[in-house]
Every structure is written in C-alpha cells, then in structure tokens.
Amino acid sequence: MKQYNVIAIMLDSLRQDHLGCYGNTRVRTPNIDQLARESVIFDNAYPEGLPTIPVRTALFTGQRTLPYRPWQPLEKEDITAAEIFSALGYTCALITDTYHLAKPGMNFHKGFHSFDWIRGQEGDPYITAPHGKDLEDYIKPAMYGDRVVGLIDQYLRNTAGRKGEEDYFCARVMRKAMDWIENNAKVNQPFFLWVDSFDPHEPWDPPSRYDTYTDPNYSGKKLIHPKYGPVDWITQEELEYVRGLYAGEVTFVDTWTGHFLDKIRELGLMENTLIVLLADHGHPHGDHGSIMKTDNNLYSELLRIPLMIRHPEGLYAGKHVHPLVETDDVLPTILDILGLGHETISMHGKSAWRLVTGEASKLRDVVITGYHESRHRCVRDEEWSYISRPDPEDDELYHLTEDPKEKVNVIDRYPEKAEELRRHLGVYFRPRLPRILSIQLRYEVQHTPAGK
C-alpha cells in the first residue's frame, strides 16, 4: 500500500468541451489545463446513471446505479470511499456547497471525520429575509408558474449579503479546502479530501470580472436560471447570453480551482498526493433544441465528462486514454493506484489505471447511461451513439467520429449498427435474477422492494 494523500475535486455540470485540455479555444481555463498537462486525461468518461445524486453514489461506492437505484440517500449497507480510507488510517473530510448531498437524511457524510456544508446554493432553503431585488428582472412570462422561479427567488435571498468575489460559492468552497489542507498537512497522517463544488451548475451568476463572454450590449432579462425543456421560449440573443454566463462561470471556477491547486503546491503536497478532477455531467445549452438537463437530452454536451488523474510521481503525465470509462470506475482506479485493488472486489466498477499502464485495452464494449425513472437510454461505444426512445418517438444513431456534435441521425443508413447497440439494452436491463437459497428466501425476495 502506498500512503499517498487523495484529493478529489468535483465540479458539478462542467462540460468537457469547455476546457482547453479537451480542445476548447474560447473559454479560458488555464489552471485546469495545467493540471491536465500533469495528469492522465480520459477522453471518453461517462456517468452511468444521471444526474447529481446517482453519480455521487457511483463515485462514493464504486457501484453502478442504473438501473438499480434512483435518486436516493446512501444506504447504511453501502461501503463508501471515506469508510474504506478511514479504516486504513486516513483522515477523511468532505467540503461542499452541493446542497443535495447535505440535505437531512441523504447520508453522504457517511465515513467522513469532518463534513463542511457551505449553505445557500440554488434553492437551498437557507435565508428567509427578502433580497430587495426585482424578481421580474430574472424571469420571462414563459417562466411564470415554473419551479425555477422559486429557485431563483431563494438564490437571490441566499446571496443578498455578498460583497466581493470571495463570497461567491466556489471561492468559499476552495477557501475552506485550502484552510483544511493547511491545517491537516501538519499532521503525520494521510488524508482523503473530497472537494465538491456545485459551480458551474446553475444559477449562472459569475463575479463581474468573469462576465466577459456575454454581449456587452445585451439589455434583456438576467436569465441566470432558465427553465428546463425546449428552447422555444427563449430568443437566440438570450440563448447566447445564457451560454456566455455559463462560460464566465467556468472561468471563475477554474480560477478558484487554481488557487486551491496553488495551495497544494505551496505546501509541498504534490509529490505525495493523488489528485482527481472530474464532473458529474455536462449541461445542454440549446445544442439539440433543449436547455438545462432533461431526461431525453442524451447527447455529448450532457454525457461526456472531464476526468483527469494526477499521479504523485508524475507517471504518464499528459497521456490521453480513449477507451470507455464510467463514474463507477473512479474509486476502483484510485484504490488500484494505491495498491489496494483487493478492496474493489465487490465493486461494479473497474480500475481504469489498467488502461493507462497498458495492462488492458478496454474495460467494456459500451457504456449505457440515462435517468433511472426515464425510458430514454443511450448506448455508446467509442465511435457510435445510439439513443433508445419510448414509442412513438424515433430512435437515433450518430457516428461520433464523423459527426461529433451529433447533428445527423444516420439510423436509416446503419440499421445493423443500431441493432447491435440496442441489443446491449436487452442484456443490461433484463430483470435481475437473485440467487435463491430456499423457499423461504424465494418468498422474501419476491415480496420485498429490493427483490422486485
């Protein structure tokens, strides 16, 4: 076992195609790009179950959630990364403003020695005092009656006391993380730190100095949190404004992630700390006719995530790994690098480090992803993406190598490829057949929710 510290940096809703290290030339992300140059970069990383909570469940446990588990708390039987590291003598801490993790009963603090929740993101019911702003400045008539109006109102209440950049959420998360490692680096004990920033998740409200991607002449509504669904209610000018806000949020997050990474370097921790940076999913911005996360928008802007792993010894720095990787592979990969592969035997996920070293050429033939409650599913290999739709909607097939933006549905030209990928759904979503040890157990399995 190698006694490396482990730091995971989760940046919620960060689109892979908005990072320079993945080919973007418009959005400025110098700090994450620098980390990428020191890391192994995974080009085809995907969440297997969406969105926020199922992804964290897979990351924290190494267990697949789709089609087994919906958005739900961690269960007491779940063995979490923090519990594993705690048993190995690590000090474990979670620092987050992702309020879904911290709601009472969600149990995502399980196994951590300390748990710091920065309150106030999005619709977190935190501040009740009025915000003093005109809510009409932030919504259009098409948004009346939509739940996002309440989220915006709560967010404005939560942020009414902000004075400067350091009061914005990602800055507060990273400052807490910097304080934590400064205090704990002095202790002769390895640590596991999970830093979970809800930004660049909506609302998109970056500090003014990062708002450089929007049209300076824009005078419309401040659409920091659009409603979910088709883009037919929003003008092209407004859509470009929203995209600009998101880009500014990404650069803001990159800046404060950079401050945190600088603190790690300043403390001399780079040589004995494994660093993982990733997102849970991306975010649609009208790329395929809808905005925000919806269960039917199973395209790369939502599905493809950034994932990079920096080895303390600088091994394989700058290497790009193309084979398919899932979020349930992340914990097994970390444990494998630490020489703890035996701890992963009961996990669904597999170590992606074997792809890096050349011990394996692939971990799986396809990834299957979607929302637990939805009948829309996406099956992908390294070249193709097949989307299964419920009747009467038409299925879709995209040749990713020739059409990376998924604009041309070629299912009529390649029906055999669509059928090849579709068959994986039949295997993957076949009802589970529990091992029956006795008549009593057969009855109990059939009459309990876990056995249905």
Predicted stretch roles:
Residues 1-452:
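Catalytic domains that recognize anionic headgroups
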